[in-house]
Amino acid sequence: FRDCMDAFPEGFKAMVPAILILCCAWTLKGVTDVLGAKVFIADLINGPAAALFDFLPAMIFVISIALAFSTGTSWGTFGILIPIVLAAIPDGDMTIIAVSACMAGAVCGDHCSPISDTTIMASAGAQCNHIVHVNTQLPYVMVVAAVSFVSYLAAPFVGTVWIALPLAAGLMLATLLILRLILKGRT
């Protein structure tokens, strides 16, 4: 019983960083709401930038990678960008594709960010140098990010999620097979 009770304060201490990250994400979302980012972006997309509408998922993907990489949090990126995406693209298959681009980019940027809590915990858990751990993850992340970017470029032109998703999976499989052939030739 005593060991169980002693574990409570340690558990609370372990949760403090995660709670702080979520609080910062909520604060960042509140700031973007007060600034009116949703309305500004929606007006921009429906106005002067309407010609770029077909490239929107790819742009959202790149923006969310950059935002998550620089802030070190995918959840904060979700909180900032998903409301903006939903305001800019209110309905249809393009909404699903755009929100998935936002979420995929945020997780990608968070995964390769050296200031991400998950990256820090993974390198600490593996007991390896933090920057070395980040560098070992980058080749894998960049291959998947490149395939995802191409898929998000193609998605608006195929028109439906039910074609875009198998197309992206096929592109990823083809990329892996090509990489396997290239790397097999080196050994």
What is each of the regions a protein language model found here?
Residues 1-2, 30-41, 70-73, 148-162:
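Transmembrane helix-loop junctions in multi-pass membrane proteins
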Residues 22-30, 60-68, 86, 102-106, ...:
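Hydrophobic core segments of alpha-helical transmembrane domains in multi-pass membrane transport
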Residues 93-97, 126-142:
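Membrane-interface alpha-helices at helix entry/exit sites of multi-pass transporters
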